[in-house]
């Protein structure tokens, strides 16, 4: 289990580093082996807390970037068939510097974009930032084993493995979703992409979302 998160200002405001650090701390229980914030710019940052499973070397620490630093990924989960995807990419001339599935996932996305999701076998939630297009790609495994929440308003886009991490940032106001509460009392689950907070949504199982 790892923890992922990110903050992007939609109006190019500078991120308060205290808020980013508080988010990092709130996710550290999900990944005790390494925790880090990557400030892609003053107004964009990705956060990761790592539980090492594959390629225990620090070279696979996250947030992870490609050699050109155009793409940044934070990834929670495990890609079971990453060796097969790696071999396929190598046959196309793609080079690798680690032995882990994070680099395979990132370079698979660079090669195939959203089509990489059709090739993945595993449990995962991840976010990829493209510095050239200023876009963010969020995706979640088909079963929904790994959680992923996000919110957006006029000033901020924020995502995290945990709902409380977004709420505690105070960047997104809390607004109770009464219909979700009623649904939970009736069915013991919150419907669709809802969370109980009208301002925060969850990526659904098998879904991907792009923000520009």
Kindly give the residue locations of the regions a language model identified.
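Cysteine-centered catalytic environments shared across enzyme families
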Residues: 1-212
């Amino acid at each position: 289990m790892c923890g992922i998160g990110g903050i992007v200002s939609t109006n190019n405001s500078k991120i308060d580093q205290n808020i980013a650090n508080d988010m990092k701390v709130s996710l550290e229980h999900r990944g005790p082996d390494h925790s880090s914030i990557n400030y892609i710019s003053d107004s964009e940052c990705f956060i990761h807390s790592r539980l090492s499973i594959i390629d225990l070397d620090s070279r696979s620490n996250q947030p992870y970037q490609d050699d050109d630093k155009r793409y940044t990924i934070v990834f929670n989960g495990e890609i079971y068939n990453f060796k097969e995807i790696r071999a396929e990419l190598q046959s196309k001339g793609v080079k690798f510097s680690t032995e882990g599935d994070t680099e395979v996932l990132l370079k698979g996305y660079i090669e195939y974009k959203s089509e990489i999701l059709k090739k993945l076998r595993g449990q995962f939630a991840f976010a990829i930032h493209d510095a050239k297009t200023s876009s963010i790609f969020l995706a979640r495994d088909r079963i929904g084993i790994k959680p992923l929440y996000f919110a957006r308003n006029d000033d901020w886009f924020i995502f995290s493995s945990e709902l409380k991490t977004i709420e505690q940032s105070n960047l997104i106001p809390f607004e109770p979703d009464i219909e979700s509460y009623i649904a939970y009392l009736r069915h013991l689950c919150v419907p669709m992409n809802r969370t109980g907070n009208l301002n925060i949504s969850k990526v659904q199982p098998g879904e991907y979302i792009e923000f520009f």
